Amino acid sequence: GVEGFRAIVVECLACAEYAVEQLNAIGVAAWRNPYAITVVLPKPSAVVLDKWQLAVEEDIAHIMVMPHVDRARIDRIVADIAANPV
């Protein structure tokens, strides 16, 4: 019901904030708008783009933190970005 949906949204928002924090910690200038699940970051390497199929517009990419995107997945994306600099 509504409470279950609310819990999913709260977790997505928390994971989006976690993604921003983890990306910032490795020197990536990631950000998101308040109450948004979209994390914006500078365009990563082609290796990362190909592996994770990130959407790109010119020199920026974004990650949509949907319910299937948990902290473990974010950690893997961040590790790949750190291991494959532009």
How should these model regions be labeled?
Residues 3-86:
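Conserved C-terminal alpha-helix-loop-beta "cap" of PLP-dependent enzymes
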